[in-house]
Amino acid sequence: MDVKRFKRVFLIVMDSVGIGEAPDAKAFGDQGAHTLGHIAERMNGLHMPNMAALGLSHIRPIQGIEKVDKPKAHYGIMQEISSGKDTMTGHWEIMGLHIREPFRVFPNGFPEELLNEIRELTGREILGNKVASGTEIIKELGDEHVKTGALIVYTSADSVLQIAAHEEVVPLEELYDICKKVRALTLDPKYMVGRIIARPFIGADGNWERTSNRHDYALKPFGRTVMNELKDAGFDSIAIGKISDIYDGEGVTESIRTISNDDGMEKLVRSMDQSFTGLSFINLVDFDAKYGHRRDPIGYGQALEQFDQQLADVVEKIGEEDVLIITADHGNDPVHHGTDHTREFVPLLVYTRGIKEGKDLGLRKTFADVGATIADNFQVEAPSIGTSFLHEL
């Protein structure tokens, strides 16, 4: 049987849009989690006609989302095999890597042992050491930082260590140097931090403003991803939103920054007017950062409905030689206890122009099936995990 190949693959990761607890959810403290289901309940039904038309309620029934007779997309559900439930783990697995050692998160701040090592390395004291919003923590500790020169260290629900400092108190070059040293320290398996972020700010007397001189010191993926294979074979690999940061630029031919989900979707639509051969890959982070961690189911629901409206433009622009894949990287149920991600299945929707009636792609045993399918499509080396579903399209 002839396999249809596509010139362009558009991959949308709806950050944290899980679709029900994974079989191993109990091990993560996530029994009963269902990001989409619980948001729909709190919203008294989600209004997402475009996702409904693609077949979302064929994966799992979601309140308010009609189960259409003939879905316009193929649909399935994916289970993560890697041992974490964070953004990097989910995305790296999508592109073909199996993460056996999870990145660590620090909901109660960093261990004193690490803080002492940072003090020794830098000769500076430390303020904060807690989970915080970047704008809130400089509001709270900015004055003390300026007085003492101590570093403001904080984290989030993700595997990150962020260091905020006033540009006139800790010059940029010094801050970057500190972050590089901390990056080296935190490669130790007992810390295993995904990203170190320099967060410079300016201002005076409590009126602080973060500058655009932020710098991320990520981990490079420990193996080759499908994006590396595409780039090396001469295909385009366009990263929209925080995709380039997640893979530390590996396998990226063009990086497009975004400031919000709306902005990301607009930039995705614009990228569809470009002539290219390869992958256009976007992460929509607001679902996770603005609503999931903040346990705001109504805000999350409204953001999903807004995404659905913008999705109509994407679907309309899909040409004969294009394929659109929509999925997620983990869950973040905004009615679940705590503020962390949740271990869940993720939805899979695959749309091409020629589908008369979408079929069930079944349970995919790893997120890497997406990467394997993309590799198969462009006939580059397949990842060591994952099964292509290209022939089913």
Curated annotation (Swiss-Prot):
Mn(2+) 2 binds at D288, H293, H341. Gene3D superfamilies: Alkaline Phosphatase, subunit A, Phosphopentomutase. It comes from the Bacteria. InterPro entries: Alkaline_phosphatase_core_sf, DeoB, Metalloenzyme, Phosphopentomutase_DeoB_cap_sf. Pathway: Carbohydrate degradation; 2-deoxy-D-ribose 1-phosphate degradation; D-glyceraldehyde 3-phosphate and acetaldehyde from 2-deoxy-alpha-D-ribose 1-phosphate: step 1/2. It holds the Pfam family Metalloenzyme. Its EC number is 5.4.2.7. GO terms for biological process: 2-deoxyribose 1-phosphate catabolic process; 5-phosphoribose 1-diphosphate biosynthetic process; metabolic compound salvage; nucleotide metabolic process. It catalyses: 2-deoxy-alpha-D-ribose 1-phosphate = 2-deoxy-D-ribose 5-phosphate; alpha-D-ribose 1-phosphate = D-ribose 5-phosphate. One of its GO terms (cellular component) is cytosol. One of its GO terms (molecular function) is phosphopentomutase activity. Transmembrane segments: none annotated. Binds 2 manganese ions. Mn(2+) 1 binds at D15, D329, H330. Its cofactor is Mn(2+). It is found in: Cytoplasm. Keywords: Cytoplasm, Isomerase, Manganese, Metal-binding. Belongs to the phosphopentomutase family. Isomerase that catalyzes the conversion of deoxy-ribose 1-phosphate (dRib-1-P) and ribose 1-phosphate (Rib-1-P) to deoxy-ribose 5-phosphate (dRib-5-P) and ribose 5-phosphate (Rib-5-P), respectively. This is Phosphopentomutase.
